């Protein structure tokens, strides 16, 4: 009898430990870094690098999607963020030419299962491809991760839509809505990025109210936590501290998660900003 009670207690303890691990939330950030080639004077990359990294460290993300990363910045990320592994390639040549939409994930928590990239074009597998009215080549990078403690797997994708192409942005949403379900294969999924659109744009509707068969119905974490749309939701600041306006930077999740926190991080230091975009953050709980 004593042995039976011991086994029951042990099983209960193990079950509680598993539940505790499974309930650990995901801290997610999306951050457009502002590319280092831009002639930004006092806001140039070398003058804000330290502030940029301290801003990230303050949130302690488990997962982070970057946009506009050039080679010198990618080298800085990998050198400075040693607790993270990175996935993604530069968009122009699939190696180091052009901007990355790379992903960082905490090495102590996640193991990479698979990774890849596709281009937001009519030929998604063609490196450096560009279509429609897009001004620039655009890419979506993804990584399939396994949570070490629980064995849970999920897909995380990160992207940056074109800043000029109206048709290209809507078609980019369609490419993502077609490709990511194939890659996810019914796994839970996350999508972050600078989409260069607001919630009124048809490209946004393609993601959150999909009509494409099999598409993931993406949930906007910020709107989930803050259901009433406000006037001070700008996520682009132009190094001027702008707050009025709409978000163009997003953290989406599939139905496997629920957002318990979501914010636009408007950290400043002596009227300086870590980038011309505010980082956006979310805390996601497994359902």
Regions found by a protein language model. Give the residues of each.
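Active-site metal-binding loops of divalent metal-dependent hydrolases
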Residues: 31-33, 159-161, 194-195, 278
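N-terminal, active-site-proximal structural segment of metallo-dependent hydrolase catalytic domains
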Residues: 21-80, 93-99, 174, 287
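Sec-dependent signal peptide recognition
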Residues: 4-13
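Active-site neighborhood of phospho(di)ester-bond hydrolases with catalytic His/Asp-centered motifs
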Residues: 65-67, 88-89, 190-194, 220-223
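Hydrophobic h-region of N-terminal signal peptides that target proteins for export
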Residues: 12-21
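Structured beta-strand-rich core segments of catalytic domains in phosphoester-bond hydrolases
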Residues: 63-157
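Short, solvent-exposed loop/turn elements at domain surfaces
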Residues: 35-42, 66, 113, 166, ...
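Metal-dependent phosphoester-hydrolase catalytic domains
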Residues: 109, 144, 167, 171, ...
């Amino acid at each position: 009898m004593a042995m039976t009670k011991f086994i029951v207690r042990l099983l209960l303890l193990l079950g509680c430990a598993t539940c505790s691990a499974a309930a650990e939330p995901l801290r997610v950030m999306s951050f457009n870094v502002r590319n280092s080639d831009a002639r930004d004077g006092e806001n140039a990359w070398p003058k804000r690098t330290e502030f940029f990294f301290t801003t990230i460290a303050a949130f302690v993300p488990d997962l982070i999607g970057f946009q506009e990363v050039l080679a010198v910045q990618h080298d800085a990320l990998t050198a400075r963020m040693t607790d993270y592994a990175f996935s993604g390639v530069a968009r122009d040549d699939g190696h180091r030419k052009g901007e990355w939409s790379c992903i960082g994930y905490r090495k102590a928590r996640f193991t990479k299962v698979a990774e890849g990239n596709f281009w937001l074009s009519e030929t998604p597998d063609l490196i450096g491809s560009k279509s429609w009215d897009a001004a620039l080549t655009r890419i979506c990078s993804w990584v399939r991760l396994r949570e070490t403690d629980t064995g849970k797997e999920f897909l995380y994708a990160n992207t940056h839509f074109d800043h000029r192409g109206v048709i290209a942005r809507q078609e980019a949403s369609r490419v993502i809505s077609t490709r990511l379900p194939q890659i996810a294969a019914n796994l839970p999924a996350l999508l972050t990025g600078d989409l260069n659109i607001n919630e009124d744009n048809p490209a946004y509707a393609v993601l959150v109210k999909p009509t494409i068969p099999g598409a993931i119905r993406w949930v906007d974490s910020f709107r989930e936590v803050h259901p009433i749309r406000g006037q001070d939701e700008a996520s682009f600041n132009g190094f001027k501290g702008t707050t009025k306006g709409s978000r163009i930077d997003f953290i989406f999740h599939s139905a496997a998660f629920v957002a318990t926190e979501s914010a636009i991080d408007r950290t400043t230091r002596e009227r300086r900003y870590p980038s011309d975009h505010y980082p956006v953050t979310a805390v996601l709980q497994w359902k």
